[in-house]
Amino acid sequence: MTKLTKRMRNIREKVEVTKDYEINEAIALLKELATANFNESVDVAVNLGIDARKSDQNVRGATVLPHGTGRNVRVAVFTQGANAEAAKEAGADLVGMEDLAELVKKGEMNFDVVVASPDAMRVVGQLGTILGPRGLMPNPKVGTVTPNVAQAVKNAKAGQVRYRNDKNGIIHTTIGKVDFDGAQLKENLESLLVALKKAKPTSAKGVFLKKVSISTTMGAGVSLDQSTLETTTK
């Protein structure tokens, strides 16, 4: 029989697996149980009321969290001319066209997000087999293929998260770090849930946000009482 670590025993003792926690109580509990020797991420899993087998019910998009993610995001931009200068001024870490593509082909990918202007897709399209499996391929649905590359760079730097349901209809993403204060994590989560509700497919029927759980990188996962969250869409 596998011996439980001290951390796992602590989690089992303090987390009620059948309970839906009030949001502030849940955040306080996660912080208490986050004992790793690094600043853990706070992640969220949202079970959606969709049939993921149907393409018209899949949910994909991006939203900027009000308090960011706590990550230092490096952004590469494929563009040229005036757009290249605008991207640099917006804080892009790498900007180019064929020269940037050559770096990617060599495996030099020191970036977390790729943005491209529409005219650059002829170059980026050749990198699909490299960028695609890493989740880096630019896509207009998440705002990374756009004429306004400067704004896309600013969004990425400001804490934009991308979301896409998996085959089980679940969204997995991050809402910050353990060292964020409780109000910041709550507001980030509520902002994400509002964005998801706005992205609800018209063909999806019934309850859309079926279950919301938050967890830390190395710690506990707790289910939330959604009535304690403000997710009214305007």
Curated annotation (Swiss-Prot):
Keywords on record: Repressor, Ribonucleoprotein, Ribosomal protein, RNA-binding, rRNA-binding, Translation regulation, tRNA-binding
Organism: Aliivibrio salmonicida (strain LFI1238) (Vibrio salmonicida (strain LFI1238))
Oligomer status and interactors: Part of the 50S ribosomal subunit.
Disulfide feature: none
GO-annotated molecular function: rRNA binding; structural constituent of ribosome; tRNA binding
Lineage: Bacteria, Pseudomonadati, Pseudomonadota, Gammaproteobacteria, Vibrionales
Name this polypeptide is given: Large ribosomal subunit protein uL1
Keyword field contains Membrane: no
Function: Binds directly to 23S rRNA. The L1 stalk is quite mobile in the ribosome, and is involved in E site tRNA release.
A GO cellular component annotation in the UniProt record: cytosolic large ribosomal subunit
CDD domains: Ribosomal_L1 (cd00403)
Gene that specifies this protein: rplA
